[in-house]
Amino acid sequence: MKGEHLGEFEEFTLLAVRALGDRTYAVPVQRYVEEATGRPTSMGAIYAALARLEDKGFVQSSMGEATAQRGGKPKRLFRVTPVGLKTARELHRVRERIWTAIAEGRRS
């Protein structure tokens, strides 16, 4: 694994893959991120984030079956790894602690 820290966009992408389930591919991930964030998202940004997540060990990819509608080209399918799931859950816990502290007026 190259690194364990995630940027905001990588986090959104990781969560989208998790929400869409195993064996999702880039197009639904892009649509999910756009809908969830309300921001336009390019396919290039999605592909780059998925590549970084795979380099870090947070997602795994495999090639799906070739389909006629894709001109015989297979889709690259993604799934969240156990390490990716653990990281996503930890990020969620950190955000909850911070928001709880804010709500309670604590500074640290």
Regions found by a protein language model. Give the residues of each.
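Short beta-strand/turn micro-motifs at beta-sheet edges
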Residues: 1-4, 65-67
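N-terminal helix-turn-helix DNA-binding core of bacterial DNA-binding proteins
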Residues: 3-45
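Alpha-helical residues within the helix-turn-helix
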Residues: 31, 54-55
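Basic amphipathic alpha-helical segments that dock to polyanions
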Residues: 46-53
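Beta-hairpin "wing" of winged helix-turn-helix
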Residues: 56-71
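Exposed loop/turn and edge beta-strand positions of beta-sandwich/beta-sheet ligand-binding modules
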Residues: 74
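Conserved beta-strand segments that form the floor/walls of ligand-binding pockets within enzyme
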Residues: 79
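Amphipathic alpha-helical dimerization/coiled-coil segments
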Residues: 83-108
